[in-house]
């Protein structure tokens, strides 16, 4: 008898435990109902009037009406954009700006051209790159860079670049 009780406990432990007050919920399938407000009619039309008929039944506007109205809207929008551009240009002028946030044309040219634009065409931000000119020329001596113009200059200066990473030995192999 004890063996049967032990077997019952073992089988109940292996099944999923369910709370005493739990129950399964079954969902009913939704019912699809078609309700006709008015009796369906067969409407006969030709191909030329089909689009107009569909648009009138669905409540969408006709293309001919919107095509007449669109150019006016586009013209008004274009006119507004032009006016906005003119107004922003006027606001950029020094007399219309705050001193903290507005730079006049001379300050802008000095910032970009450097030295008030006299004789310099590279720009004010490029002035510091002159220090790197020698560094960029020395890059040609390194044979591991896959630049064709640098490889050509390295092979011509093989005696001067032989002390760096094998110099002409590697550049001759890959050239």
Curated annotation (Swiss-Prot):
Subcellular compartments: Nucleus
Chief place where the protein resides: nucleus
Pfam families: VQ
GO cellular component: nucleus
One GO term of the biological process aspect: defense response
InterPro entries xref list: VQ, VQ_8/17/18/20/21/25
Keywords tagged on the record: Nucleus, Plant defense
Span of the annotated motif VQ: 50-59
Misc note: Plants over-expressing VQ25 display enhanced disease symptoms after infection by the bacterial pathogen P.syringae.
Its biological purpose: May function as negative regulator of plant defense.
Name of the protein: VQ motif-containing protein 25
């Amino acid at each position: 008898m004890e063996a049967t009780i032990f077997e019952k406990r073992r089988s109940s432990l292996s099944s999923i435990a369910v709370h005493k007050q739990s129950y399964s919920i079954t969902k009913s399938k939704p019912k699809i109902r078609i309700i006709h407000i008015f009796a369906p009619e067969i409407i006969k039309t030709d191909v030329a009037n089909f689009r107009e008929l569909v648009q009138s039944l669905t409540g969408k506007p006709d293309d001919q009406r919107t095509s007449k109205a669109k150019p006016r809207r586009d013209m008004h929008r274009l006119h507004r954009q032009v006016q906005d551009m003119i107004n922003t240009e006027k606001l950029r002028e020094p007399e219309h700006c705050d001193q903290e946030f507005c730079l006049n044309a001379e300050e802008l040219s000095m910032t970009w051209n450097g030295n008030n634009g006299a004789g310099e065409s590279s720009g004010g931000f490029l002035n510091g790159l002159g220090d790197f000119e020698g560094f960029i020329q020395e890059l040609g001596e390194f044979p591991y860079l896959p630049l064709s113009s640098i490889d050509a200059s390295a092979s011509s200066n093989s005696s001067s670049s032989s002390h760096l990473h094998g110099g002409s030995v590697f550049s001759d192999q890959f050239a």
